[in-house]
A protein has these predicted regions:
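Catalytic cores of glycan-processing enzymes that make or break glycosidic bonds
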Residues: 1-654
């Protein structure tokens, strides 16, 4: 879809599709709900709707854990709109089951559990899939031919259909646990399709129908003058059709993570191979997205500049490093006076025998079996090939001993990144090897590390420019980037050069290096940006104002309010939203919870109940929030709509 070039700054609303509720939707928001949301949005002056990813994640509630970079999630299907015959009683029975579950006694609203109004994802998906299978049995021959024609123009769907069938036949286990077909090549996939096409074609037909529904919804939004903004995660689940069938696109030796120790578990890309293919897989992915979206958000855009790569044998990310990066070579270390023995001392974890016995007691011998002895000394060190954290976890050591061993294995000044190449570890200045160096040796190594960082930053700029330029080649969609966190110096310039919008979140848009860390004035937000009040991984605006930002004098100052002003409740929400509306950002898009909070009656009593996700946690409440107000109710909430019209007019009049 082509992004409409508005002549004014735009107001948008951000809402997970799953969170929308209408009389026709069945337990979760559906593609067919988007036009009704769009009509309400247009009536109050909202011109953009942003949703989270809608790819198939199976029974995983996180929309960022996709089984396919291309396939749509069946959970968003509007069953009543399928031309295929369905037993009306089946749909009514599922609706009744979901209603009864919501009324079940004992379901109390808590931060960590599913509240009565939240999505019961497993039940919804299982029920819909059961009904969809019965519909498939009634599909007309003419429609199957149409689906076959559609499949020829969507070659990804064949491998996805095979993957889905095999996953079902293997009790939904990851492909790495299958007894057969774990490592198919193209010939294997072709033979497998011929053998299993009749069974697998259900998923082809289903994707064809889902694309029909999503395309129709997107086109209706277009006719309303409301742009649809999608979300394209940079990373793909290991247990996905893409990795299973197109292994060469990925570097399975590493998982993506972050320098603070988070291991996200997603394989990183093999950019060299993708480049040799002219980024075919990525171009296909973007073309698929362009069928539905006028604009799209690049999740974790920093990963296109550099990614924190974690060896696959670790479950933490402390032994990770940025790829690409300029390596420290053995020759450079030798030139500084470090011989082979001292390079080994710096690049492997070492364990004095007395330390092992003191820490591990009777289990010290088990630890020593995983290590290698240094000559005949009472000194041990990690092997060239390990142990990594997963090997330690699988050892017969007690839980306490394993927990004590993990940080010791990370005690390396240098990490090996290849034959005769290294990089400094994340916390190298606190390692045993570093603390043993002389002052001059530390200065020399720091100088070398800084020079390598300077070269790496040039590599990151080159990588980001090349990859993001590829993603901008079509030019019809508006491209926005999630550029939060510690960013390399080159990122803002590359985004500006390519016309990609960055992200400005009020609570994190501060001058962190200055005393009192003042907020960046709203008037200083760049034009090429999306301004927002909160994101799906944060508290809501109302929750932030009542918690972290309570009595924040710097916030009051940037809002131009008196020091005794009360920012709690709807008054604080209104003050922040109005300030953001006056920012020069091309787009200001707010979570629907923050817009509803303009009117106290439209929100839950506890703002924590409206959180989408709490990062780093696995709990039933994550990704299951659902609006308590239906789409049918929105147009008659006159106080809310009047407040939104007034808010949106601030942008239109700029």
């Amino acid at each position: 879809m082509k992004y409409p070039h508005f002549r004014h700054t735009v107001t948008g609303v951000v809402v997970p599709l799953s969170a929308i509720k209408s009389r026709k939707s069945l337990g979760i928001g559906e593609f067919a709900d988007l036009p009704m949301l769009g009509r309400w949005a247009a009536s109050v002056g909202i011109e953009l709707i942003q949703i989270l990813p809608v790819n198939d994640t199976g029974f995983e509630t996180s929309p960022y854990s996709a089984l396919s970079a291309f396939a749509l999630h069946p959970v968003y299907a509007r069953l009543d709109d399928f031309p295929e015959a369905a037993n009306p009683g089946d749909i009514a029975a599922l609706r009744s089951e979901l209603k009864n579950r919501r009324k079940k006694p004992g379901t109390v609203s808590t931060v960590s559990g599913i509240t009565p109004g939240n999505i019961n994802f497993d039940t919804v998906l299982a029920g819909k899939m059961r009904i969809l299978r019965s519909m498939w049995k009634t599909a007309a021959a003419a429609d199957i031919k149409k689906a076959e024609k559609w499949a020829k123009n969507n070659p990804w769907v064949q491998n996805y259909a095979l993957f889905s069938l095999l996953k079902e036949e293997n009790e939904l286990k990851s492909w790495v646990e299958w007894k057969e077909f774990r490592n198919p090549d193209r010939k294997d996939l072709s033979r497998l399709w011929k053998k299993k096409k009749d069974k697998a074609f259900f998923w082809v037909w289903l994707q064809w129908r889902l694309e029909e529904q999503f395309t129709a919804a997107s086109r209706e939004l277009d006719s309303l003058g409301v742009a649809l903004k999608g979300d394209i995660p940079i990373l793909i689940n290991e247990d996905s059709a893409d990795l299973w069938a197109e292994r060469d696109n990925f570097n399975q030796e590493f998982r993506a993570g972050s320098p603070d120790g988070q291991n996200w578990g997603f394989p990183i890309y093999n950019w060299e191979y993708l480049r040799s293919e002219d980024y075919r897989w990525w171009r296909d992915r973007l073309n698929q997205a362009a069928k539905f979206y006028h604009a799209w958000r690049i999740d974790h855009v920093l990963g296109f500049f550099r990614i924190w790569a974690v060896p696959k044998g670790d479950f933490s990310a402390w032994n990770g490093y940025f790829k690409p990066s300029a390596p420290v070579t053995r020759a450079e270390l030798e030139a500084l006076g470090f011989d082979t023995g001292r390079i080994t001392w710096l690049s492997r974890a070492h364990f004095p025998g007395n330390e092992l016995r003191e820490i591990f007691g009777d289990e010290a011998g088990l630890v020593q079996k995983m290590l290698e002895q240094v000559g005949s000394e009472d000194l041990w060190r990690s092997r060239p090939d390990g142990p990594d954290e997963k090997e330690a976890a699988a050892s017969p050591l007690s839980v306490e001993a394993r927990e004590a061993l993990y940080p010791l294995l990370r005690n390396k000044t240098l990490l090996s990144t290849g034959e005769d190449s290294f990089t400094p570890s994340r916390n190298y200045q606190s390692t045993r090897g570093w603390l043993s160096l002389t002052g001059d040796e530390k200065l020399n190594l720091k100088d070398l590390f800084q020079r390598k960082l300077n070269v790496s930053e040039s590599l990151w700029e080159q990588s980001g420019r090349e990859l993001l330029s590829m993603m901008k080649t079509d030019g019809s969609m508006l491209v926005c980037a999630e550029d939060l966190g510690a960013i390399p110096p080159s990122v803002p310039g590359v985004l500006q050069e390519l016309g990609i919008l960055g992200l400005k979140v009020t609570r994190w848009s501060r001058k962190w290096d200055e005393p009192s860390q003042p907020y960046i004035p709203f008037s200083d937000y760049p034009e090429l940006s999306v301004a927002t009040s909160s994101v799906h991984d944060s508290t809501t605006l109302r929750g932030w104002l009542a918690g972290e930002a309570f009595e924040d004098k710097e916030l009051l100052k940037v809002l131009g309010l008196k020091e005794d002003a009360d920012l709690s409740g709807s008054a604080g929400v209104k003050a922040v939203l109005e300030a953001l509306q006056k920012a020069p950002s091309m787009v200001a898009a707010y979570p629907i919870q923050d817009l509803l909070a303009l009117i106290p009656d439209c929100v839950s009593e506890n703002p924590e109940d409206e959180r989408i996700n709490i990062p780093g946690t696995v709990q039933p409440g994550n990704w299951t929030w659902r609006m308590k107000i239906s789409l049918e109710e929105l147009p008659v909430l006159h106080n809310l709509n009047n407040a939104l019209k007034e808010l949106c007019s601030l942008r239109r009049n700029q």
